[in-house]
């Protein structure tokens, strides 16, 4: 799947006395059946003990109008005394944020937040819940990781409503307020910070700079600055930055999913026969895997993979996509072809093929939208690959779905992926075109274009005859077992001139490195019909093309028997390199869904001399 759209350490704050007991929340939601036929969407109208309020309980679907009533309900119904935990652990504001997100994440996994025991359903979990033994923590809380600063639920109203740290103690200001103007100024400052914080949390506006200007400005009499302004600045800025980061991710995701809302990219992907037929053959050609299987399709798009799965005999298919437009389209497509599951239809009226349900959500939030039964899925299928394999970072969503929704021993399709690299010659650049444009020499333009290519990766299809070196394997991924951090890697490899790359003069110029990937539906899961999907320049072209990284200057190469001039620089006509030793690092970029690539290059001559070129950094 690819598109062409090219000090969180706050100071400790002291807590006052424990809060008073509040009104008990009402009864939790009734537990429903957990069979495959009873999946329901967890819409915004979820009922529960608190009626129609906006604050969702940490453990059940009850909603409340206030933080106090919610935590009173948690204490009485779920034995989770939030205020006691906060007081006894000495948590600051950020600790509270982390605790809430930690508990929500564990409950989503049907895991006890206190002892870690795992259950098959939310009802079993709620029946087990017990108070946390604070002394057993030995000073280290399990929610201490900064990862829990990121809201587990999108737009979690509870995080916006926390008042446990409302602070009326003048001592916390850091200096006495002797001037009347200071007192008034500080009140205005707090209001400004609160307003700006809400702006960041609610609409993702970039007002952090405004925070910093407001929180450090002196009062009109010039005598109220420094620590007085700094105290609210610290707390507000830190939560603002955390929230802004989360909003930045959300913004990129919205743009990403929005790019898949147009039909052009889907026409291109469906028309990619190599891609689509590989998935079709893997799903339809392995009946022992697919017949009667429950299937999760992550990033379903038009739903083509779900249709293949249903046609292959799957008993239930859940198709997930982050684009509301494509969810609507996939639903209509499934309905038009007689595969859409209708939960309102009587069982005797349903056909065996009516098995597909399409859900609008990210994979990471699936269990907030539907109730995933304890037996989970037999098969996870996804077309997640981007340019250079890892662009778009969709693999992390697939791995999350594998770890949370695929049953032990279940199949992930595809189950392997490999990145390859090779050196390419002049034909892989635009130089030949510019050297003869209707009989005119425009090579000056070609040189400028090639120079620009040395700063930006190019996604294009190269002809196999333009590959001048042997192929090297950069990295292989076992998608059934790999960890998310393995998406970031460094690979060292060597490139030697191939037989077909040798020119008549004996010297061949290598202009850069090209990367491509294969994915495998291996006989580990596809026993009847293993399939390999290749984006190699030696195979039929695909919509992924290849990813081209051009050197700042080309490197002359020759076979080992070539004579060299000892005084000449390695990689030149007089001293061609017999081998290029390269190290490539590919890591997820700070910009969500992008990747950074660094390339280190060293040429080695036949007499053993070496020459290294400056590191090149690319962003894709």
From Swiss-Prot:
This protein's record includes keyword Transmembrane helix: no
Pfam families membership: ANM3_C2H2_Zf, Methyltransf_25, PRMT_C
Record flagged with keyword Chloroplast: no
Domain SAM-dependent MTase PRMT-type, residue spans: 253-582
Catalytic activity, as annotated: L-arginyl-[protein] + S-adenosyl-L-methionine = N(omega)-methyl-L-arginyl-[protein] + S-adenosyl-L-homocysteine + H(+); L-arginyl-[protein] + 2 S-adenosyl-L-methionine = N(omega),N(omega)-dimethyl-L-arginyl-[protein] + 2 S-adenosyl-L-homocysteine + 2 H(+)
Family to which this protein belongs: Belongs to the class I-like SAM-binding methyltransferase superfamily. Protein arginine N-methyltransferase family.
Bias (Acidic residues): 18-45
Residues annotated as binding S-adenosyl-L-homocysteine: 275, 299, 321, 323, 364
Function: Protein-arginine N-methyltransferase that catalyzes both the monomethylation and asymmetric dimethylation of the guanidino nitrogens of arginine residues in target proteins, and therefore falls into the group of type I methyltransferases.
Subcellular location as annotated: Cytoplasm, Cytosol
Active-site residues per Swiss-Prot or TrEMBL entry: 383, 392
Single GO MF descriptor: protein-arginine N-methyltransferase activity
EC numbers on record: 2.1.1.319
Description of its domains: The C2H2-type zinc-finger is responsible for substrate specificity.
One term under GO cellular component: nucleus
Organism lineage: Eukaryota, Viridiplantae, Streptophyta, Embryophyta, Tracheophyta
Gene Ontology BP terms: chromatin remodeling; methylation; regulation of DNA-templated transcription
Top-level taxon of origin: Eukaryota
Name of the protein this chain belongs to: Probable protein arginine N-methyltransferase 3
Keywords: Cytoplasm, Metal-binding, Methyltransferase, Repeat, S-adenosyl-L-methionine, Transferase, Zinc, Zinc-finger
InterPro entries xrefs: ANM3-like_C2H2_Zf (IPR049482), Arg_MeTrfase (IPR025799), Methyltransf_25 (IPR041698), PRMT_dom (IPR055135), SAM-dependent_MTases_sf (IPR029063), Znf_C2H2_sf (IPR036236), Znf_C2H2_type (IPR013087)
Ranges of biased composition (kind: Basic and acidic residues): 1-17
Region described as Disordered: 1-45
Zinc-finger ranges (C2H2-type): 55-78, 110-137
